[in-house]
A protein has these predicted regions:
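Mid-domain alpha/beta scaffold segments of enzyme catalytic cores
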Residues: 1-157
Length: 157
């Protein structure tokens, strides 16, 4: 039996000391594909390094997690995102979306960045991986407003 882990952040420092064993164990257990959603520019390099080390098993995505959408850093995050899309191959745009669980005051900026990332997914013909907490109706409105038949993806949260 073969399985796909559709959402794992194995590139984070918590796995640094035993990542090779974790991936070996996953493969031996039948989990042969590991999909790696990005968080923000701080995780891109480690994610890409892991996918290069295990090109048959680890597949990177690129995106800005809604909890990483901050007024003071969003311009540099967007520049990084667009540069990465030009320079690398990604499975999807993700993990993107809206998250009001921790902080509700950034909703309008999260909505703007979520919309922009969906537009990039449409432009690059990539599916999206959506993260939503306590903002499902708002997220659906954005997706419906864009109304694009080319858009596909999954909700992870």
């Amino acid at each position: 039996m073969t399985f796909i882990d559709t959402h794992t952040h194995l590139y984070l420092t918590e796995f640094k000391n035993d990542i090779d064993q974790v991936i070996k164990d996953a493969i031996e257990s039948g989990v042969t594909k590991l999909l790696l959603p990005n968080i923000d520019s701080s995780t891109t390099e480690s994610m890409l390094n892991l996918s290069k080390k295990y090109p048959d098993n680890c597949f990177p995505m690129i995106g800005i997690h809604p909890c990483s959408v901050k007024e003071e850093s969003i311009k540099s995050e967007l520049m990084h995102l667009e540069m990465m899309l030009l320079e690398n191959k990604f499975l999807a745009i993700g993990e993107i979306g809206l998250d009001l669980y921790w902080e509700k005051t950034s909703l309008s900026l999260q909505q703007e960045i979520f919309t922009h990332q969906i537009e990039l997914a449409i432009k690059y013909e990539l599916p999206i991986v959506i993260h939503v907490r306590e903002a499902f109706d708002e997220a659906i409105k954005i997706v419906e407003k864009l109304n694009c038949d080319k858009l596909s993806g999954v909700f992870h949260c």
